Each structure stands twice: as structure tokens, then as C-alpha cells.
Design a protein with these regions (language model features):
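Membrane-interfacial loop-to-transmembrane alpha-helix junctions, especially the N-terminal start
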Residues: 23-36, 101-115, 169-183, 228-239, ...
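Membrane-interface interhelical loops and short amphipathic "cap" helices
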Residues: 43-63, 123-143, 192-212, 248-269, ...
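N-terminal signal-anchor module of multipass membrane proteins
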Residues: 2-74
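Membrane-interface helix-loop-helix junctions at boundaries between adjacent transmembrane segments
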Residues: 94-110, 122-181, 195-206
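Membrane-interfacial, low-structure loops and terminal tails that flank and connect transmembrane helices
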Residues: 2-24, 85-105, 163-179, 396-401
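Alpha-helical transmembrane segments of multi-pass membrane proteins
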Residues: 235-287, 296-386
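Hydrophobic cores of alpha-helical transmembrane segments in multi-pass inner/ER membrane proteins
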Residues: 3-4, 63-81, 143-160, 210-228, ...
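Aromatic-anchored segments of alpha-helical transmembrane domains
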Residues: 37-42, 116-122, 185-196, 238-252, ...
């Protein structure tokens, strides 16, 4: 009795018309919502720690994060269940077998991500009980959590990408939009994970540009190479920026105050993240180079993207960061005066470029000044990152399982 309605809802989800909106299967929307929950919850959780301190596990921010994980895992489990028991022909043609079950590759990636996220919860609680408060975002339990939510977002990209690669002309743009949207969420996750290396005060240091050259070109190139939209890298970068700006503008609307010492500044509302980098500007160049150089060798294209990315990103962020530290940015739009946590001591250093990396433990670490030789090494890193992006993007174009 239960199997019939489930079979009616799920049968031939790739070839027939399942429950859908505008011809797009329901699971594509749900998995995109799951990715959004993860991104929103992560930024909210970081703001919660910067505003209130460590709280119970059952905070609303944590619940939004794990809602995203459970949505992604549950949706993927339904797809695996359907392909294993109801849609065996499709499973033989396009499924991936694991432990006797058959499902789309993207579903297995999401399920693994959900398991990792759920495993990280007790691990993180034990870590805090054993070692106290976190002084950095990057800790062993947080890396397990990060592996989980990156897997879910990557699985969401794969799920919508398969639909794009197998769809007809009538709805291919809708799949491409969902794919590019989840790609924008992946870029946002990279922004979140590198927060401590990319404070505005570090934008005149070589370390900031090295980190940016590692994480951004690879994703931008892969999205631009595999999406069938026009200007996909630019759209993904704008989606990332839009999400970040929404958090900058919305979080300070809600009241909050510190509950855990030491408290070095008065906080009355939730602390927003720093204003996002202007990644869409070099993303335009990435799209343009890929469009105009289709017949060129990928190594040459990677070198061109590496040089162009670093040139544009360096010039834009060098001067934009000066603006963000000025009095002109101390308003609700840019939030230049209100993005430091309550445990950060107040002082003139808040609005200056740092010469040292001030960590939560140990002595300050000197930051490397930007130089011509340093920018050359950053360009080389960006070119290698772009080349990996070409490999990744070419593989993504061929994914149909």
C-alpha cells in the first residue's frame, strides 16, 4: 500500500514527468534549498559566536545548518530507494551501485555528506568539553563538518548538472540556473572557510592574495566550463556576493549581546560578516577568456586566466579594502565599523591594515608585504588553480549518472 504512492511519485524521475515545477523535478529544488540552508546557517552561526559566544547545540543557527544536511540526505535516500526498488532499468543504465543499493552518483555524495555532518556534531561537543572554546574556525570537528556540507553542496551541483547534461532544449536553462546557483553557494562556502585569512585588514598582505588564488579560480573556471548559461562564473560570483550582502544587512537588525567572558566591546545586535570581496569583476574576465579562446590550449588559457584574475582582483581589492576601512564605509550598507566579535579588543588597529596576523593563541605572525615577486608567485598559483578548474569543468560536462 505504501509502495504504490511512493512509486507513483518517483518512478522514472529522469525520463518521465515527476512532481515538478516548470518541468523541473522536485528533488532539484529541494537539494538547492538544502544548500541554501547550509550557507545561511553557517553565516548565522558564526555571527552567533561573534555576538553571544558559545551556546547550546540547539541554537536556531545550528538547526538551520543541520536541516540543510538532513534535507540533502533524506532527498538523496529517496532517490536511491526509488532507483533500487522501483526503477531498476534506469538504475542499470545510469545508477551507481553501493552496498547492494543503486542510486545517482550525486545522491551518494549527498548521503556521505549528511553522515559526515551528523558525525561532526558529537565530535564537536566532545572537542569543546575536552579543549574548551574554539579560537579558530578551522578545527578538526569543524573540518569534518566542512567536508560534509561541501559534499552536500557538491552533490547538489552534480544532481542539477546531470539534469542539465541530459535535458532537452526546452528546460535546459532552468537546470543551468539551478546548477549555477549551487555553484555560487559553493563559492560562498569557500569564502566562509577562508574568513580568518581574508579579513579586510589583511587585504594588503600577500597571504590574502595567495589564499584567494588557490580557492577562487578553480571554482570559477569549473562553473564557467560546465554550465550552459551565458556568463556562468559571473552569475555564480554575484549569487555568492548577494548571499553575503543579505547577511551583512539583515543580521544587525536582530538584538543580541555577549554571554561569555571576556567581553571587550559593547554589542547590542548581531555582528555581521565583513563585506564580500568583489569577485564578480575577475569572474567577468574568466567568462570572457573561456568564451573567446575555445580553440586555444587549456594551459595557455589557464595562464591567461591566472594573470588576468590576479591583476583585476589585486587592483580592485587593494583600493576597495582601503575604502572599507575608511569612515565612508562605517554605515549599515558596508558595516565597516561593526564586524568585529565581542572578544576583540577595541583600538585604532581596527581600521588599519595589519602587519601581523593576530591569532587567538600564540604570538602575532608577521604578514608578508605585497611585492612584484610575490604577485608573480600568486599568478602562478592562480594559473594552476585555473588549470585544475578546466579539468574539473570538462569532467562535469560529461557527467550523466
Amino acid at each position: 500500500m505504501v509502495g504504490k504512492p511512493l512509486r507513483w511519485m518517483m518512478t522514472n524521475h529522469l525520463n518521465q514527468k515527476p512532481l515538478s515545477l516548470s518541468g523541473i523535478p522536485w528533488f532539484c529544488y529541494v537539494i538547492s534549498i538544502a544548500s541554501t540552508c547550509i550557507a545561511v546557517g553557517l553565516q548565522w552561526d558564526i555571527s552567533w559566536h561573534m555576538t553571544i559566544g558559545r551556546d547550546t547545540f540547539w541554537t536556531p543557527a545550528h538547526m538551520v545548518i543541520y536541516l540543510g544536511g538532513i534535507l540533502g540526505g533524506f532527498t538523496s535516500a529517496i532517490l536511491v530507494f526509488n532507483m533500487t526498488f522501483f526503477d531498476k532499468n534506469e538504475g542499470m543504465n545510469s545508477g551507481v551501485k553501493f552496498w547492494g543499493f543503486t542510486g545517482p552518483m550525486a545522491a551518494w555524495v549527498c548521503i556521505w555528506g549528511t553522515v559526515a555532518m551528523l558525525t561532526s556534531a558529537p565530535f564537536d561537543d566532545w572537542w569543546h568539553n575536552a579543549y574548551g572554546l574554539d579560537v579558530e574556525i578551522i578545527s578538526p570537528p569543524h573540518m569534518v563538518l566542512a567536508a560534509g556540507f561541501i559534499a552536500i553542496v557538491f552533490g547538489a551541483m552534480l544532481l542539477t548538472l546531470v539534469q542539465q547534461n541530459r535535458s532537452n532544449v526546452s528546460n535546459i536553462n532552468l537546470y543551468s540556473w539551478l546548477y549555477t546557483y549551487t555553484g555560487g553557494i559553493l563559492i560562498l562556502l569557500m569564502v566562509i572557510l577562508t574568513t580568518e585569512y581574508s579579513f579586510t585588514n589583511k587585504h594588503h598582505s600577500l597571504e590574502f592574495y595567495k589564499i584567494s588564488a588557490i580557492v577562487y579560480p578553480v571554482v570559477l573556471v569549473a562553473i564557467s566550463k560546465s554550465s550552459k548559461l551565458k556568463w556562468p562564473a559571473t552569475i555564480a560570483a554575484l549569487i555568492c556576493m548577494f548571499h553575503r550582502c543579505i547577511m551583512v544587512w539583515v543580521l544587525p537588525l536582530f538584538e543580541g549581546q555577549p554571554l561569555l567572558a571576556p567581553i571587550y566591546r559593547e554589542i547590542t545586535h548581531f555582528v555581521p560578516p565583513p563585506f564580500p570581496v568583489l569577485l564578480f569583476i575577475p569572474a567577468i574576465a574568466v567568462d570572457l577568456i573561456i568564451i573567446k579562446s575555445d580553440k586555444m590550449n587549456d594551459w595557455v588559457r589557464s595562464a591567461a586566466i591566472g594573470f588576468t584574475f590576479v591583476s583585476l582582483f589585486f587592483v580592485v581589492q587593494w583600493y576597495f579594502s582601503e575604502f572599507l576601512l575608511s569612515e565612508s564605509a562605517r554605515n549599515w550598507f558596508f558595516s565597516g565599523h561593526f564586524n568585529k566579535p565581542y572578544w576583540s579588543r577595541m583600538g585604532p588597529y581596527e581600521f588599519k591594515f595589519w602587519e601581523y596576523d593576530y591569532r587567538g593563541f600564540g604570538p602575532p605572525i608577521p604578514l608578508t608585504p605585497v611585492s612584484i615577486a610575490g604577485l608573480f608567485s600568486v599568478t602562478l598559483i592562480a594559473a594552476i588553480s585555473a588549470r585544475v578548474g578546466f579539468w574539473w569543468g570538462e569532467w562535469m560536462r560529461q557527467v550523466k549518472r
